[in-house]
């Protein structure tokens, strides 16, 4: 069986810096587990590892799609499976790093994906019902079928609401219960990073301010000039949608900052809710460690123990 490590957690918790050191020490390569870092030209708002950081340790699945492409989780899973085997064959350990719960779970739980034409017909049906009766009506149906999943997604997230109903029709099972664990496929070592809420929210505030200073508005403006608009999946990324509204004149600069910070806090909360369900994750409170070096040492010790590395 292949070895597979992962470092997950909410946005702004510090996954990038920690993962670089962990990968260096356990002879690993990093596979991005972020649905928006896949896209080229979206660097500031997605907090990608810099080119210098990517040169320290090999990184994969960053800048592999154009923003007008609607990248799917099935495609992501397929690419990651190939990478896991090739990285293991090199004698190294693949490390999933990111906070996109569905992408993470599609890999570690080895989701089965159905033919697009079958899925599309079901999706079209639910979208038509939403058009006729409204999203709140369909969300209430999801609450009855899969209350656990309904709790961790936004009632306004039509894409995820429809996806969960689609999976239920295809499998007869609630999306939240599809736990075909991958223990028989991978030796897993999964680490979760978290911070106390006040500290995490303070980091989010600082990160958003820094992104604006680094040129997030200009980055989105450049994408807009290339014809990228809110109809593309890439522009649903945190910050990008809000900057679009700002550039269109719907909100002012102060409202822009407040909106991004508020939505990022909400997203971080949903991320933690998602990952906390996974009993395989070994959690580390970043604030419990006096310095990053000590945290990295503890993570490496845990992973090496999971993999039987002496």
From Swiss-Prot:
The record marks 100, 123 as: Interaction with substrate tRNA. Belongs to the IPP transferase family. Pfam families: IPPT. Catalyzes the transfer of a dimethylallyl group onto the adenine at position 37 in tRNAs that read codons beginning with uridine, leading to the formation of N6-(dimethylallyl)adenosine (i(6)A). This is tRNA dimethylallyltransferase. Coiled coil: none annotated. It catalyses: adenosine(37) in tRNA + dimethylallyl diphosphate = N(6)-dimethylallyladenosine(37) in tRNA + diphosphate. Its cofactor is Mg(2+). Gene3D superfamilies: 1.10.20.140, P-loop containing nucleotide triphosphate hydrolases (3.40.50.300). GO terms for biological process: tRNA modification. Transmembrane segments: none annotated. Residues 34-37 are annotated as: Interaction with substrate tRNA. InterPro entries: Dimethylallyltransferase (IPR039657), IPT (IPR018022), P-loop_NTPase (IPR027417). ATP binds at residues 9-16. Substrate binds at residues 11-16. The gene is miaA. Monomer. GO terms for molecular function: ATP binding; tRNA dimethylallyltransferase activity.
């Amino acid at each position: 069986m292949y070895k597979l490590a992962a470092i997950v957690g909410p946005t702004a918790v510090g996954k990038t810096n920690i993962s670089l050191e962990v990968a260096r020490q356990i002879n690993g390569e990093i596979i991005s587990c972020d649905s928006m870092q896949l896209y080229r030209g979206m660097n500031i708002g997605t907090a990608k590892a810099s080119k210098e950081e990517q040169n320290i340790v090999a990184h994969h699945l960053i800048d592999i799609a154009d923003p007008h492409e609607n990248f799917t989780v099935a495609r992501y899973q397929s690419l990651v499976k190939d990478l896991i085997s090739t990285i293991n064959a090199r004698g190294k350990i693949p490390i999933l790093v990111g906070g996109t719960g569905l992408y993470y779970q599609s890999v570690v739980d080895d989701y089965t994906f159905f033919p697009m034409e079958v899925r599309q017909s079901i999706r079209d049906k639910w979208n038509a019902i939403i058009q006729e009766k409204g999203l709140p009506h369909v969300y209430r149906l999801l609450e009855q079928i899969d209350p656990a999943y309904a709790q961790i997604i936004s009632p306004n997230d039509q894409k995820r609401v429809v996806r969960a109903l689609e999976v239920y029709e295809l499998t007869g099972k609630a999306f939240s219960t599809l736990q075909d664990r991958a223990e028989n496929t991978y030796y897993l070592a999964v680490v979760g990073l978290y911070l106390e809420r006040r500290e995490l929210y303070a980091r989010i505030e600082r990160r958003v301010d820094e992104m604006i200073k680094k040129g997030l508005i200009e980055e989105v403006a450049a994408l807009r000039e290339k014809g990228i608009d809110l109809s593309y999946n890439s522009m649903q990324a945190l910050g990008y949608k809000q900057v679009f509204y700002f550039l269109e004149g719907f909100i002012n600069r102060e409202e822009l900052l407040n909106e991004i910070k508020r939505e990022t806090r909400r997203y971080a909360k949903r991320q933690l809710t998602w990952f906390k369900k996974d009993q395989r994750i070994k959690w580390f409170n970043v604030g419990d460690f006096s310095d990053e070096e000590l945290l990295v040492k503890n993570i490496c010790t845990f992973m090496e123990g999971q993999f039987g590395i002496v």
